[in-house]
Amino acid sequence: MRCPFCHFVETDVIDTRKLYEGEVIRRRRRCRACGRRFTTYERIESVSLMVVKKDGTREPYDREKIARGVRTACYRRPVSAAAIEQLVNDVETAIMNTDEHEISSQAIGDAVMQRLRDLDEVAYIRFASVYRAFTDIGKLREAVDELLDREGVRNGHLSPKPAEDS
């Protein structure tokens, strides 16, 4: 592995850890020339998957594009980087398990929204406002109302949960 600081090609691995249930390996390395340390990540290379966009064009699947969208939606929200990474991993796993060589951008967006709804409601609304391209405040309000109905919240108050039979 080439050192990002001095570009020397020989480095030593000083620590290795599995992340995200073994889906990613994190390696801490030290350059043999300059002695500086850096981190690398290893993951399975994704298959050649094409994303079919709304206008019919196709582009290669890009995990980082999903991660950027989720990070933007979660900006200044109490969502950890690890939670965002796990969400992206979950979406990617769902996409790869379809065994298709093409997937619509809508299917990817729906998978992200489904998981964001459970992670952070404000991030969900932020993502939905861009993904669904709300054209007016009424559409945004519908999305918020849908979320509130799902959570049992109306007019700022929690709706009572149904009584459980003992």
Swiss-Prot record:
Cofactor: Zn(2+)
Single annotated GO MF: zinc ion binding
GO biological process: negative regulation of DNA-templated transcription
Coiled coil: none
Zinc finger (unnamed) stretch: 3-34
Cofactor binding note of this UniProt entry: Binds 1 zinc ion.
InterPro entries cross-referenced by the UniProt entry: ATP-cone_dom (IPR005144), NrdR-like_N (IPR055173), RNR_NrdR-like (IPR003796)
Residue intervals of the ATP-cone domain: 49-139
Keywords: ATP-binding, DNA-binding, Metal-binding, Nucleotide-binding, Repressor, Transcription, Transcription regulation, Zinc, Zinc-finger
Annotated family: Belongs to the NrdR family.
Described function: Negatively regulates transcription of bacterial ribonucleotide reductase nrd genes and operons by binding to NrdR-boxes.
Protein name listed in UniProt: Transcriptional repressor NrdR
Species name: Chloroflexus aurantiacus (strain ATCC 29366 / DSM 635 / J-10-fl)
Name of the gene this protein is made from: nrdR
